[in-house]
Amino acid sequence: MSSLSRELVFLILQFLDEEKFKETVHKLEQESGFYFNMKYFEDEVINGNWDEVERYLGGFTKVDDNRYSMKIFFEIRKQKYLEALDKHDRSKAVEILVKDLKVFASFNEELFKEITQLLTLENFRENEQLSKYGDTKSARAIMLVELKKLIEANPLFRDKLQFPNLKSSRLRTLINQSLNWQHQLCKNPRPNPDIKTLFVDHSCGQPNGARAPSPANNPLLGSIPKPGGFPPLGAHAPFQPAPTPVPPLAGWMSNPPAVTHPAVSGGAIGFGTPTNPAAILKHPRTPTTANPSMDYPSGDSDHVSKRTRPVGMSEEVNLPVNMLPVTYPQSHSYPQDDFHKNVARTLSQGSTPMSMDFHPVQQTLLLVGTNVGDIGLWDVGTKERLVLRNFKVWDLTKCSMALQASLVKDPTVSVNRIIWSPDGTLFGVAYSRHIVQIYSYHGGDDIRQHLEIDAHVGGVNDIAFAHPNKQLCIITCGDDKTIKVWEATSGAKQFTFEGHEAPVYSVCPHYKENIQFIFSTALDGKIKAWLYDNLGSRVDYDAPGHWCTTMAYSADGSRLFSCGTSKDGESHLVEWNESEGAVKRTYQGFRKRSMGVVQFDTTRNRFLAAGDEFLIKIWDMDNTSLLTTIDADGGLPASPRVRFNKEGTLLAVSTHENGIKILANADGVRLLRTLENRSFDASRSASETVTKPLMNPLTAAAAAAASAAAAGTSSGNAAPPAITALNGDSRSLVDVKPRIADEPLDKSKVWKLMEITESSQCRSLKLTDNMRTSKISRLIYTNSGVAILALASNAVHLLWKWPRNDRNSSGKATASVSPQLWQPPSGILMTNDITDNPEEAVHCFALSKNDSYVMSASGGKISLFNMMTFKTMTTFMPPPPAATFLAFHPQDNNIIAIGMDDSTIQIYNVRIDEVKSKLRGHSKKITGLAFSNVLNVLVSSGADAQICVWSTDGWDKLKSRMLQIPSSRPSSIILDTRVQFHQDQLHFLVVHETQIAIYETTKLEPVKQWPVRENSSPITHAMFSCDSQLIYASFLDATVCIFNASSLRLQCRILPASYLPQNISSNVYPVVVAAHPSEANQFALGLTDGGVYVLEPLESERKWGNPPPAENGSTSALSTPPNGASSSDQPER
């Protein structure tokens, strides 16, 4: 059925609903299969109308269509069966078993037998799994929750759960428009025509009473243009008997998929590549939030898109991690925590902010560009301005004569746009005069000149970063009506796109279906789309307002929005239907005459924000009505600039008095409070050591390989690192003489290593268990932080859960409250498939993001366990080879990287039970795997002391290197090499018995190392704290050392006597460390005797000592000690 015919069905459905033909409405829904009315379905389930439930479902899916459908029908029929048993209607139960449930026996015979055995019980609740079954009403409600999840995940229901957003009585409106048009064609139109029928075209009667000719032979109608010549009615094209010419890009483009891809723009990848790359945006399956139970006139978004999954593996195990939650767009009862009502910071920039952008990884770093050409870098957590640079041309001799003349005539320059690169190692500034300047960022206040490009004649109106052909590029547009693409390392120009007839105002690069493209808007309101070739524009559409318009995608890359203001001050915020190049939704609530160009931003795939009428206005993406307004305690300009940080916890807003207000939601407030505490600790430490405030040198090494410049562009030499004094003054180190050596130190204030030697100096808790436990091989906190999971060397899993009570209101893990060793009522243990000698097997596991499942192995098959029931869901991959390490892909939990004992890494797709790739590069077993979702790489480590970096796009090996291991040190015990990514996703931790090191991923070079002294105890394990500020390391002598992660200097040492009982054997030591996912100063240890301990600092201390002072007063570059050397603070152990 054509798209227009489908839309006609929706119009009829709306009409029937308005006319109260309720049964007919649902019959048409079922027969057409276009719209699944979740509200109706819910009502029928709650009322137990099982025949109607299955009849209605039958219009959309059948039992054997896919595994989702099978599970839906199974749950319904199982509930019907249980209700018959509950009523002691055995004959009805047998009938249901034979007619309805037997079809599932071929798929799971054991389950069918178990269901059949319920007939033998007097009360089916005697079955352990059904012991908590309540009354019929509550059981139906619980089942309904599961059914809704299955329906939302089922691809057959995609695009069928959301009713289009139609104005009321849309069909009547279209008929009236048609009648009006017909009336205009009458030869003798009457002032008040009498419409008696819709069965034939309207025509006013002849004055002499003669009959009007029929439409078929009416010469007037034959001579008028076809409907295609008339303006479209509403947002849809008119009904046409013949197909209209397809635009060059087939609408906008075609077939974007439903799964998000970790590309520059957060765009989407799919299951295949379209045959026509120029057709990438047509018929999108947009994974937006949706309301499954709304009435007809109000629904308007495409539905959440999810992958299929095998029966028995419900929830999130094999669903994409970035799947969106279902929300209810018609309900405005959002938690107040969602909104940025709190003014958390007020920053004084000194000139009017024109553009702002938060760092993509460090959530509190804010770039600001102003109307006088200044650029500033703020840490809004500490309220400190790290950098202030005034505009100047780096090399005037390399600039065009036009620019030189322009600057001589009028030296004033404004920043039009400032923006970070996707990984935060570069940022670009577009100025109102010809120039684009690119800086590299090395952490803290260290920014360096990278590229200066004389990009456009006139102003450079916008700048963006993109990754065409896996190469970082810079995209600019300007007053000269062109868009240009530059290579980000050398500044070489790659493309110039011409075709606009007015200055180009903005660019919006995006990625879909392996196709990179760019949207551009010009001051005449034209929107064009470009591929990275020389074939010209693929799209030519008009933006609402026909003037200054910017475009942006939602964070997941699935929905396209634009915001523009006309010359008359009329503002338009709209969502686009990419398949048709038409406006899908227009948001209401703007002032009729905006006093400036309205700016906007999106956050969390859920909200839109725009600055208008001295306010910040907020919309739900799925509702055109204004959701709320925020005045930020006043002081805002008429059209304030707005910018969210990546996580959506902070919102930067420009103020009237050359300042910026930082608004925070509840999560943002907590983030800033955490940083305030850390800032206070750091400043106290700084005053005690008489040194300047520390910056994070780990992040300083985050710059990508982008330091060289090519001919034709100006690439500035690295400037001396800047420091920021406490008064915010930004100066070069050249201008500041070090005073530390000249000032006498107060010895009582010199920094001192924190040593914990007895139990009274910290909080420690041994987790009790009632079974004889073997060595703890693996240990992890659940992602929620409320439990600890351990895997012992006897292949048994242990799960401790903390209670929520008066002593522990959060319910999270703590050393102050004892948890319970949790077991299901059945007494079943999660036990891995084992070999003949499990004690010598390699044990490994990986936990799903929602803590519902654990994938685990102990030398035998890999097992998938349900964490709620401890039930084994499936087993796969029998040895040999045996799995030695497991890691879920960060974008798709269907994909698992499995390290093997034969030195290979297998990329396994759970959903289709297939090995997609086999990576070869190591010579011994794999001992560590870690993904970076920023760099799109997998880092592996092996027993061969080799580290490899693999691209997750094509699974090619990018780099490899051997660890630097002192040749003079024999290996005392065989220990793994482990890897773990830093929070910035750019660096990773390497742990070996001889050393701890931090590597920069793209260059695969160590930026910091801490080698173990000769004849000292080897390292057994180490791990970052949840905020990557600390590293917890355990040693063979049971000592635990806590390092400052930015400097790899020892900050605290915990001796065994402080947490182990006195009578314990000297052979007992920690073999694994786990860090709490949200409490940075809490960690757990798994010991050789099977003990698990949780450690925290005293409540009076709150932390494990103070950070050590920076070496030699330096705060920037990370140094690497020579091979085998010891750091200056190396303790005697």
From Swiss-Prot:
Gene3D superfamilies: YVTN repeat-like/Quinoprotein amine dehydrogenase. Residues 34-92 form the CTLH domain. PANTHER family: TOPLESS-RELATED PROTEIN 1 (PTHR44083:SF45), TOPLESS-RELATED PROTEIN 1-RELATED (PTHR44083). The N-terminal TOPLESS domain (TPD) (1-209) binds directly to a 12-amino acid LxLxL EAR motif peptide. It holds the Pfam family zf_topless. Expressed in panicles, stems, leaves, spikelets and seed endosperm. WD repeats lie at residues 348-388, 410-449, 455-496, 499-540, 543-586, 590-629, 634-673, 771-810, 837-875, 878-918, 921-960, 1014-1053. The gene is TPR3. Residues 4-36 form the LisH domain. Probable downstream regulator of strigolactones signaling. Functions in a complex with MODD and HDAC1 to down-regulate the histone acetylation level at BZIP46 target genes. BZIP46 is a positive regulator of abscisic acid (ABA) signaling and drought stress tolerance. Tetramer. Interacts with D53. Interacts with MODD and HDAC1. Interacts with WOX1. Interacts with MOF1. One of its GO terms (biological process) is regulation of DNA-templated transcription. It comes from Oryza sativa subsp. japonica. This is Protein TPR3. SMART domains: CTLH, LisH, WD40. Residues 287-307, 1099-1133 are annotated as: Disordered. Keywords: Repeat, WD repeat. InterPro entries: CTLH_C, LisH, Quinoprotein_ADH-like_sf, Topless_fam, Topless_Znf, TPL_SMU1_LisH-like, TPR1-like_2nd, WD40/YVTN_repeat-like_dom_sf. Residues 1112-1133 have a biased composition (Polar residues).
